[in-house]
Amino acid sequence: MFSLLKYSVKINVNLDNGVYVFDNESATGKSRLYSLVKKYSAYGEPVAGYTFEDFCRGLDITAVLNPKKFALVVLDRLDMYSNRSILSLIEKSAHDCIILVDCKNDFQVNIDYDWCYINMTANAIEVS
């Protein structure tokens, strides 16, 4: 479970530590969640986000898959940059933080994960 309730758009994640994958339906709030996580991370909150653009810029994903530093990690478009090394790191980190995964295509990898669902309103995003 993780919540950030002090900002104008609240984030509430009703999940235990582990890897959770969103379905690939468009316009549900996943991109907004990613944007808010990046914004709140800049405010010093224990959240992080990583996307294909970060990968292309050469940013090291190990900086965000750090459960000692982050309670919630959002991995956007993971299917575009995942490899065995990244998936292994995700598996290790998932014991100590919540990792939410968005893919543009079906998520077909050999790691343990569950599905998650997002509900967005004007003032809140809830993931369960």
Model-identified regions with their sequence ranges:
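Phosphate-binding P-loop
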Residues: 12-17
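Conserved P-loop NTPase "ATPase switch" module shared by AAA+ and STAND
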Residues: 64-85
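Post-Walker A alpha-helix
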Residues: 33-35
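Hydrophobic anchor at the beta1->P-loop junction of P-loop NTPases
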Residues: 22
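N-terminal pre-Walker A segment at the start of P-loop NTPase domains
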Residues: 1-11
